Amino acid sequence: MADSHGDTGATMPEAAAQEASVFSMTDVVLFSLIVGLITYWFLFRKKKEEVPEFTKIQAPTSSSVKESSFVEKMKKTGRNIVVFYGSQTGTAEEFANRLSKDAHRYGMRGMAADPEEYDLADLSSLPEINNALAVFCMATYGEGDPTDNAQDFYDWLQETDVDLSGVKYAVFGLGNKTYEHFNAMGKYVDQRLEQLGAQRIFELGMGDDDANLEEDFITWREQFWPAVCEHFGVEATGEESSIRQYELVLHTDIDVAKVYQGEMGRLKSYENQKPPFDAKNPFLATVTTNRKLNQGTERHLMHLELDISDSKIRYESGDHVAVYPANDSALVNQLGEILGADLDVVMSLNNLDEESNKKHPFPCPTSYRTALTYYLDITNPPRTNVLYELAQYAADPAEQEQLRKMASSSGEGKELYLSWVVEARRHILAILQDYPSLRPPIDHLCELLPRLQARYYSIASSSKVHPNSVHICAVAVEYETKAGRLNKGVATSWLRAKEPAGENGGRALVPMFVRKSQFRLPFKATTPVIMVGPGTGVAPFIGFIQERAWLRQQGKEVGETLLYYGCRRAAEDYLYREELAGFQKDGTLSQLNVAFSREQAQKVYVQHLLRRDKEHLWRLIHEGGAHIYVCGDARNMARDVQNTFYDIVAELGAMEHAQAVDYVKKLMTKGRYSLDVWS
């Protein structure tokens, strides 16, 4: 009460003073408003008088916009063969380019095309072009999935009922027999086009990357073109010849700000990073941790942590992180030296076909050093078409003959290529060293070499626990070839050398992006999970376990969590040993089962432990609705594990083998048996 009395107890002189103060303030405010309004009126009226009369903006002409009709482009440029490619690592694109280049030998003109850049509904108009043919080089990614650039095409094929009568086509698929869904994309495209009324003019080709993909392609190609000639009534105009696709332009006086320094897409994108980040716009992540995981000296297994703060990159447990590596500077320098080239010359390789969407084989202008370091694959054995093109530069007739033989489709040539190049793992530098007379111009070599591709790793962390970092688990690849050379993995050697930020005053940066995966924990946290991941195959399960531990901390009920892990010896390469022991101790891991393959006389693998626990596993699968996850080697481990589950289901489910196989296949269809494997 005293406070309220105090509020009204002012004397008359004080009240008068307050009133005068209020009136003077009101005057000031009113005066300011009037002045402001007058000023605004004069200023903005004047500006409005200067605005030109509005005129309708003309729409850009069809030639200035991105062409979505590949048929119109074919008509405009006189092409009658289009080769579409679904490519994740660049191989399918390379094959498509080779096929489109072949066409000129038969009096035809071809073009390679990315289905992501065109409206594939235009296929129905293809018969408007005389002797038109659509070829599809389709790679299968992961577990029967389309590649990123073919996803829209795949979706369209599933949804459309367009009539493709009169469309002539052929398909070559790229796959790997160690995977469950071998060449699924190639098979689907081939079958679906026929269902829509298109006419297959040559049988489906299926390349196997687990064997010899290059030989599979050559064998299919040498039978494909005679079938095309017979169907369209044309003849080959001559032998395969060397035709340059790009012309060299040297930049002797160019602003360095206009020169690419390793960026994958937009110039200066590494200096001015803008989301969203993807394959064409990777994020430069700082390496904050790079530690060796194992105790042994025979191999180097490592754990890296990449800082993705402020990138707006989101990921989930089970996703993949892709990194763009750089070639070893020593190899690059040796290439420059053996070719007698100045690697710091700035140049551009410009497509001679002005109508092509692909203006350069890699970002240009750039230096030879940058191209060989960041853009070109210099460590994988070159394909036969590269050897064929290089042969013309061999001064020694014997060396030229050998190169042409290896590039041929003869049985002897294929065998020589397989043994001398593929099995001996000879990269381009090794070939130049072994053939002293072979010295191609560096610009032509840069045109011929394939692009250096991103490397994918299963993310070894959970975004619930580590929202601002992505973790990688990898083994440094290093081996001696049959020729006695020491070869090193491009990406793992590069990652191994990345020192965490702050250790030497600088930042170790990794261009990266995240690729979504179907390898996901069950929607219901109470669903049991059975994880099988020997070696670095444990990576995604570290993320899974972290996430389940986080859920438990949030008070959620979590189902049984079983891990079957395998390594050689406990003291040598037991990855994440302390972390896994901690998860077992706190109850997140219901079971931690470790198979040591070299700890005892008789080797023990993860499938042996699965057989040991068959009753419990069957109960979890059949009654508990458990989800099974397998990560690691596709060639042996994944197949053996799958066969083990067939046996468990057959025995404890009282089924015939065929019934057990069908049971497991249905688990896969329902998303209860997931694979994240590689070969």
UniProtKB/Swiss-Prot annotation:
Transmembrane segments: 22-42
Stretches assigned to the Lumenal side: 1-21
Positions with a binding annotation for FAD: R425, R455, Y456, Y457, S458, C473, A474, V475, Y479, G489, V490, A491, T492, W678
Chain's gene name: POR
Lineage: Eukaryota, Metazoa, Chordata, Craniata, Vertebrata
This protein's name: NADPH--cytochrome P450 reductase
Residues that bind FMN: 87-92, 139-142, 174-183, 209
Source taxon at top rank: Eukaryota
EC numbers for this chain: 1.6.2.4
Catalytic activity: 2 oxidized [cytochrome P450] + NADPH = 2 reduced [cytochrome P450] + NADP(+) + H(+)
Note describing how the cofactor binds: Binds 1 FAD per monomer.
EC category: oxidoreductase
Signal peptide: none
Membrane topology: Single-pass membrane protein
Family: Belongs to the NADPH--cytochrome P450 reductase family. In the N-terminal section; belongs to the flavodoxin family.
Subcellular compartments: Endoplasmic reticulum membrane
Keyword Transmembrane: yes
HAMAP family linked to this entry: NCPR (MF_03212)
Cofactor(s) recorded in Swiss-Prot or TrEMBL: FAD; FMN
Organism: Oryctolagus cuniculus (Rabbit)
Example of a GO MF term: flavin adenine dinucleotide binding
